[in-house]
Amino acid sequence: MTRATPDPALPRTGAPSGTARGSRRVWWLLLWVALITQMVVLYAPSAPGGPEVSGLDKVIHASVFGAPALFALLAGVPPRWVLGLLVLHAPVSELVQATMLPSRDGDVADGVADVTGIALALGAFMVIPPTRRW
């Protein structure tokens, strides 16, 4: 018996193409960069000084949770893991800041901003057509 060779004109099924694998690698790289940035921003012994812009702290909190959420989803991590772990991490990070970092303080509003960033990332992921995700 001879095996039929696939018709190159037909779309491939099964494993992702080389382009898809390459794109996923980029999302994984961005995810790791975002996670490292998140750890530095959340757990630095003292909050970095800067201009006092109203609401900037909340935007930063939303960003350091939203970016890893979006990159993880785009990398193909199941949404339940992304949402579960990051939503759990939000209050934990505030508790650590309040109890273990003397020059930092925990804030419920920061936790709300964290979860808002995660929700915005999920919303962005859902509106990106699947064919454009990777």
Which role does the model predict for each range below?
Residues 2-111, 115, 119-134:
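Bulky hydrophobic segments
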